[in-house]
């Protein structure tokens, strides 16, 4: 569960309504793979990830980034039940994919950077603080099934 004030919730949902999930999702996942290259090992089937340009223009990275942000959107609709919302994804990433749960935190922080880049002055420190709460809550929910 993420505890947001009414003002924080309005800031998060208001900004999110303007997010282009296709664009931001691909950019966020791409940046994760470039900035933290060890995360690429989970994406062997994505083809060429050999350079930053290859990563950022990879159609599979873009498609998966969109999928990730669509899941994040579901989380925003269920802030009071993030663990339930992400239970199956947590199980998948833990039991089948063996993703280090620290990567969820990294992706959340990269997403915040991408949002700041896209929204500039509209992404105020108050909006950032609210988003940091949300991405921390989502990362925690995704790590829930880990032993």
Swiss-Prot record:
UniProt domain Globin: residue ranges: 3-147
Pfam families per UniProt: Globin
Positions where S-nitrosocysteine occurs in the chain: 94
Disulfide bonds: none
Keywords, alphabetical: Acetylation, Heme, Iron, Metal-binding, Oxygen transport, Phosphoprotein, S-nitrosylation, Transport
Tissues where the protein occurs: Red blood cells.
UniProt-listed PROSITE patterns: GLOBIN (PS01033)
Positions of modified residues (Phosphoserine): 45
GO molecular function: haptoglobin binding; heme binding; hemoglobin alpha binding; metal ion binding; organic acid binding; oxygen binding; oxygen carrier activity; peroxidase activity
Positions of post-translational N-acetylvaline modification: 2
Functional note: Involved in oxygen transport from the lung to the various peripheral tissues.
Subunit structure: Heterotetramer of two alpha chains and two beta chains.
Family per record: Belongs to the globin family.
This protein's name: Hemoglobin subunit beta
């Amino acid at each position: 569960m993420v505890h947001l004030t009414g003002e924080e919730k309005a800031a998060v949902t208001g900004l999110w309504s303007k997010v282009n999930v296709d664009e931001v999702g691909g950019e966020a996942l791409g940046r994760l793979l470039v900035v933290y290259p060890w995360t690429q090992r989970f994406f062997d089937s994505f083809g060429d990830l050999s350079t930053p340009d290859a990563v950022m223009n990879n159609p599979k990275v873009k498609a998966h980034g969109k999928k990730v942000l669509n899941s994040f959107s579901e989380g925003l609709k269920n802030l009071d039940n993030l663990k339930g919302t992400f239970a199956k994804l947590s199980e998948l990433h833990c039991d089948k994919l063996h993703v280090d749960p620290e990567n969820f935190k990294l992706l959340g922080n990269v997403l915040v950077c991408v949002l700041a880049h896209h929204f500039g002055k509209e992404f105020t420190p108050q909006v950032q603080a609210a988003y940091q709460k949300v991405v921390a809550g989502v990362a925690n929910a995704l790590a829930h099934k880990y032993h």
